[in-house]
């Protein structure tokens, strides 16, 4: 490793850090005192960092994981939550016991599915699909190109 060799050569410490989704890691390397950076090996990645999926997918696995996550968040999870809401009288009570912002997110998604974005006919479904496509494949791409111009 280039940086590792130069840190040893110039006797300078190296602070290496990284993230993987919600996890983070840090390694302090002090020449001739601690293990060198290149002698350690990262464990195999189990998941793809969300920043990679959202902003910089660069492998087919990233595309597949993004598509799977997108499908589940659009068609699987909301449908399961709506079905639970309609059939289980204790759904709201159980949902309110979830941690953090989850109760709000789940209940807002149920409200969105049953009230705000409920389609009444086929034309509503087509309109929703067109708007979603435009958001994902036009607006988001334009925003990424604005935030990270290709010439950088």
From Swiss-Prot:
Pfam families: ThiF, UBA_E1_SCCH
Domain of life: Eukaryota
The keyword NAD appears for this protein: no
EC number(s) recorded for this UniProt protein: 6.2.1.45
Active site, per annotation: 51
Annotated catalysed reactions: ATP + ubiquitin + [E1 ubiquitin-activating enzyme]-L-cysteine = AMP + diphosphate + S-ubiquitinyl-[E1 ubiquitin-activating enzyme]-L-cysteine
Keywords tagged on the record: ATP-binding, Ligase, Nucleotide-binding, Ubl conjugation pathway
GO annotation, cellular component aspect: cytoplasm; nucleus
Isomerase is among the record's keywords: no
Transmembrane segments: none
Alphabetized InterPro entries for the sequence: ThiF/MoeB/HesA, ThiF_NAD_FAD-bd, UBA_E1_SCCH, Ubi_acti_E1_SCCH, Ubiquitin-activating_enz, UBQ-activ_enz_E1_Cys_AS
SUPFAM superfamilies, alphabetized: Activating enzymes of the ubiquitin-like proteins
Gene Ontology BP, a term: ubiquitin-dependent protein catabolic process
GO molecular function, one term: ubiquitin activating enzyme activity
Enzyme's top EC category: ligase
Pathway participation: Protein modification; protein ubiquitination
Function: Activates ubiquitin by first adenylating its C-terminal glycine residue with ATP, and thereafter linking this residue to the side chain of a cysteine residue in E1, yielding a ubiquitin-E1 thioester and free AMP. The Y chromosome form could be involved in the survival and proliferation of differentiating spermatogonia.
Family per similarity comment: Belongs to the ubiquitin-activating E1 family.
Additional free-text comment from the UniProt record: There are two active sites within the E1 molecule, allowing it to accommodate two ubiquitin moieties at a time, with a new ubiquitin forming an adenylate intermediate as the previous one is transferred to the thiol site.
Subunit description: Monomer.
This protein's name: Ubiquitin-activating enzyme E1 Y
Origin species: Osphranter rufus
Biological classification of the source: Eukaryota, Metazoa, Chordata, Craniata, Vertebrata
GN (gene name): UBE1Y
């Amino acid at each position: 490793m280039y940086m590792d060799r130069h840190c040893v050569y110039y006797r300078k410490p190296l602070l290496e850090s990284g993230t993987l989704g919600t996890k983070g890691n840090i390694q302090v390397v002090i020449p001739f005192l601690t293990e060198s950076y290149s002698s350690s090996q990262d464990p195999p990645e189990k998941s793809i960092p969300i920043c990679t999926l959202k902003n910089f997918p660069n492998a087919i696995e990233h595309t597949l994981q993004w598509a799977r996550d997108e499908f589940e968040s659009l068609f699987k999870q909301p449908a399961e939550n709506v079905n639970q809401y309609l059939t289980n009288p204790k759904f709201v009570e159980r949902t309110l016991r979830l941690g953090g912002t989850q109760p709000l997110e789940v209940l807002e998604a149920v409200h969105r599915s049953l009230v705000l974005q409920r389609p009444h006919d086929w034309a509503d479904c087509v309109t929703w699909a067109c708007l979603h496509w435009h958001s994902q494949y036009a607006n988001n791409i334009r925003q990424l190109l604005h935030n990270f111009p290709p010439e950088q």
